[in-house]
Each structure stands twice: as C-alpha cells, then as structure tokens.
A protein has these predicted regions:
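Charged catalytic and DNA/RNA-contacting regions of genome-maintenance
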Residues: 1-183
C-alpha cells in the first residue's frame, strides 16, 4: 500500500514516507504516524482539530487510516465549513484506508505499542498509558503488521509531538510560503 512501501526505488530519499492513523471528534484530533523505512514513530493530540491540519499538511503522509464510517462521522461533526473544506483539500491527495473501529481502541493500542517496542510501559518515552492517541498508534501498527505479515523490525521508540512546542503554520500559509513543497 502507499504507506507501507519499503522498496528503495519507490522511496523518496528526501522525504519521510508516513503512514498515519487519524481519529477526529468534537474533543479534538488524535493521530499517530509511522515511517516504516526509517522507524520514525510518533503520536499527537490536539484539542482544536483545525490545528491538526497544519501537522497533517507538514507530514504529507502517503496513506491515512481512519475508522470505518469516517465520512459519515465527519459530516455529523459541526467543525465548520472552512475546516471541512481544508481537510478535504489535504485528504484529496492522499490514499484513505478505512479500518475497523476496534483497531483504534486506546487500551489495545497501548498494548500493541508496548509489545512492538518490547517495553513494559511507555513512561521512558514520556507517554502515559492513558494517552488518547495510543488508539491511532495501535491502528498504525496493526495495519503495518497485516500488510507486512509481521512486526516492523526497526521500531525503537515513540515520540510525542506536543502542540505548542513548535510554530504551527496553517495549510494556506504553508502553501503560499512554499515551506514544504514548491509549486
């Protein structure tokens, strides 16, 4: 699949090749992303879904995993037309793969992450076992294992991308300044 490519000739040496899992509701956005070629593995949550658009745009994932019924769920959320339009613009360029909702379960995700990293807890990475984005982290790992028919062998750590620790530029600004891509 686009997010699980490992062939050298299909990878761009200049950019990461992220597979991202996304969960979105009125409480905010939760996501996790993984580059199987480098082992980079991270998660994040934001209370304002619009802030996540900046993260999503800067990561430029090759594939996004969403819970089944994501389109209907997105329609039912009252997040505003500007957000929905911008999300559709960003997602329009990316392969979207629906996964069963239980793949995004937070407790199962925590177990999956610990098992893949070979640890008993996530405190050494600064991540609480109750972190809401562990659901998407588990979904990314389960999907990668399904496609690869085994565990990714190069995962050593998981990092938390914290909202507020970096300057966030909205997608329109990123586009106009050509920060990540040139036209």
């Amino acid at each position: 699949t686009p997010g699980t490519v490992l062939e050298d000739r299909q990878l761009d040496g200049e950019r990461n090749h992220f597979l991202l899992a996304l969960e979105l509701d009125k409480k905010g956005a939760r996501a996790s992303w993984l580059d199987l070629s480098t082992g980079k593995f991270a998660l994040s949550q934001t209370e304002r879904p619009y802030d996540f658009l900046s993260i999503l745009n800067s990561l430029s994932p090759k594939e996004i995993l969403v819970p089944e019924g994501f389109d209907d769920h997105l329609t039912s959320l009252d997040l505003g037309s500007i957000f929905k339009d911008e999300l559709e613009r960003v997602l329009g360029e990316i392969t979207i793969t629906e996964r069963p909702g239980f793949d995004f379960d937070q407790r199962s995700g925590a177990r999956e992450v610990m098992e893949n990293l070979g640890v008993m807890n996530l405190e050494g990475f600064g991540i609480d076992l109750g972190h809401p984005a562990l659901g998407p982290a588990g979904a990314v790992l389960v999907y990668a294992q399904d496609v690869l028919r085994g565990k990714p062998g190069n995962l050593r750590r998981i990092e938390e991308y914290r909202d507020g620790e970096a300057l966030l530029l909205d997608p329109a600004t990123q586009r106009n300044l050509e920060v990540f891509r040139t036209s």
